[in-house]
Amino acid sequence: MPKEHKKRGRREDQKKRKRDHDDESASKRFRKDDIEHVQAENPLQHVANDAPRQDAAPFYGMLDEQEQEYFKKADEMLELNQFESPEDRRIFLASVWKEAEGKELKMATSQTSRLLERLILLASEDQLKSLFQKFSGHFLNLVQNRFASHCCETLFIQAAPAVSQENASVKTEALNTPPASDPDEIIVSMENLFLYTLGELEGNIGFLMTEKYASHVLRVLLVILSGEPLEKQGKSVTQSKKKEKVTISGAGDERILEKRVVPESFLEALEKVISDSVSGIEAHYLRSLAIHPLGGPTLQLLLKLELSHFGKSRAKDEKSIIHRLLPDNPIAEGTESAILINGLVYDSVGSHLLETIIEHAPGKLFKQIYGEFFKERMGSLARNEIAGYVVGKILERLGKDDLEEAMRQIVDQIPSLVERNRTAPIKTLIERCVAREVDCSPIKAQLETAYAGPHGFEVTRILKLNEDDGKPRARHGESNEKVHGSLLAQTMMTVDGPLGQLVFDSLANLSPELSIQLARDGTASRTLQAALVSRNATVIFRRKMIQQFYGKIGELALDPKASHVVDAIWYGTVGLAFIRERIAEELAENENSLRESQVGRKVWKNWQMDLYKRRRNDWVAQARTTAGNEVFQSFPDESQSDVAAPARTHRASRHMSAIELARQKFAAAKAAQAKDGKKPKKGNNPTNGSGETPRSLVAQ
């Protein structure tokens, strides 16, 4: 009897596995189970079906082995950047560009893209335009490629400033440029190149928002169109956290865009992109996009640009993103808007969108959201790891009366927040109370109790200093807790009053050993640096604190972390010229070891020790001028110390003019005369530039 005809088992199994794999990949596009239904009906998916997918992308060819070897060596040379002269590097770059001619697409879509990124970083405006034109017509495929997407991102960032430069300078000869050597070359402005690129992506924006590689490039392009500054890589929503940072040794290659003036065509294109990105998408799918790991950050950026560039009145436009997300007026429990807000508060992705809404929403809308969902819940929300950041954004928009009410709720939760090491809401609360002139006494009382030790308030508990026992720790987790603790301590010191004095007193009472440990700790030392240059630090505190390091300055100057504390001591010795000279003497005693160390050489330079060694009198005169011509004042009244010590920051170390010094000394003399009931005695000290005699130096 004939058997039923069947296909071979292995081929059928392979097809079945392929179908299962495709289904599984599709279901992973959204991370929430309730969004799986979106895959079948989401309009974004229909757009994606029409767009070129990665498995159907054109193949641009491969480099042969000889070309790969050449480009690999060129990449290594550019990474090291050890050319004898700029001219040598220019010649080398010209030869690499010549070798890459006609191979740009092959390089961009392979591992050689690293070299192409470095070439873009060092390219001239003409070279950027040429590469733009080589990529033209292929951008839709390139932005979806694992390697080429990074090249596109770098190209956009490097080319963006040229748009503003072209528009700033009126070039009447722009259209009359002599023909280039290449008859096929098209002369076009950088502005039009960006617009042509956007035209290629038009109709696919919805799909690209959730594409693994293209979503990051799309965000960069949106920022460029808006003229907004591009945030640093560590905190930016425009770049992938997994992106390899391609750098050039010794070059200023931080790809940061400052705020720029962009042409009107860019703003028109941006408005069209914002409109096209959500047009035709039902509200249900748009809300699902809010918690998508790739689409969520893109939606945040679109919403931010919509409200900041086209007016908050856009909230009334039914086609706007903010109205599509929150259509109900008023927003009340049970409405679709309420369901969305309650769902975003505790979501790791969606909470960022809620922060954007709170930060940029019109005042009337913000008051509705705050009064309906957050006014009575500020304390409980602050305890949550995710919702705590939403609380921080809310605090930034509250008026004085609402802030006082929110403070009362959050203050009750401070012991719980400290126990859970969630100090970010406390830090923001202190900052806003200072800005709104709200009394911080309740916060001070709770923090003093929460961080109490055998000797009262202990700053080491905030900084987690005693927990460093030399054991290896995870990169994140506890290190983040230390960072947040350090930021809290620094914020407390900005408060002029009992709250800030908690930290200053605790630091001043540390033992010399613990002070050295504090200076050597990479995170905790930032608190010490901030304390030394704080405008609220008294002369008494700075003197006591710096004395803890006597005899150890040479060691600290050689430590990569503690060397920053030594630099801060220079600014911390304003009004303490004798101590500044004492520190310089210790540095001079350790000259050999400092000169042999890269870290030590920086400290030596910052303290101007070459001048100290060669012309000590000039150094002393300059040091005393910047440290205060009144030189060292021993044990001034605590009430006057804040007045006597000028504001000290790393930026504000300017020289005081003669008239300013005269006024300062006259005020100090009058205050002393009023207190003692007699005129100050005149000595034989040399006079300053104002003709007044400074007080004598008091030895320690």
UniProtKB/Swiss-Prot annotation:
- Where located? Nucleus, Nucleolus
Q: Where is the composition biased (Polar residues)?
A: 684-700
Note the InterPro entries from the entry.
Answer: ARM-like, ARM-type_fold, NOP9, Pumilio_RNA-bd_rpt
- Cited Gene3D superfamilies: Leucine-rich Repeat Variant
- Which Pfam families does the entry link to? PUF_NOP9
Instruction: Provide this UniProt record's keywords sorted from A to Z.
Output: Nucleus, Repeat, Ribosome biogenesis, rRNA processing
The UniProt regions of compositional bias labelled Basic and acidic residues, in chain numbering, are: 10-39
Instruction: Map out region (Disordered) in residue numbers.
Output: 1-49, 634-655, 667-700
The Pumilio repeats extend over 200-239, 336-371, 372-412, 509-547
Task: Tell me the Gene Ontology biological-process terms attached to this UniProt entry.
Answer: endonucleolytic cleavage in 5'-ETS of tricistronic rRNA transcript (SSU-rRNA, 5.8S rRNA, LSU-rRNA); endonucleolytic cleavage in ITS1 to separate SSU-rRNA from 5.8S rRNA and LSU-rRNA from tricistronic rRNA transcript (SSU-rRNA, 5.8S rRNA, LSU-rRNA); endonucleolytic cleavage to generate mature 5'-end of SSU-rRNA from (SSU-rRNA, 5.8S rRNA, LSU-rRNA); ribosomal small subunit export from nucleus
Claim: Repeat is one of the keywords in the record? yes
Molecular-function annotations in GO: RNA binding
Just give the chief location class.
nucleus
Please tell me one Gene Ontology term that the record gives under cellular component: 90S preribosome
The entry assigns this protein to a family as follows:
Belongs to the NOP9 family.
Q: What does this protein do?
A: RNA-binding nucleolar protein required for pre-rRNA processing. Involved in production of 18S rRNA and assembly of small ribosomal subunit.
- Would you tell me the protein name for this molecule? Nucleolar protein 9
For this protein's source organism, the top of the classification is:
Eukaryota, Fungi, Dikarya, Ascomycota, Pezizomycotina
Give the gene symbol.
nop9
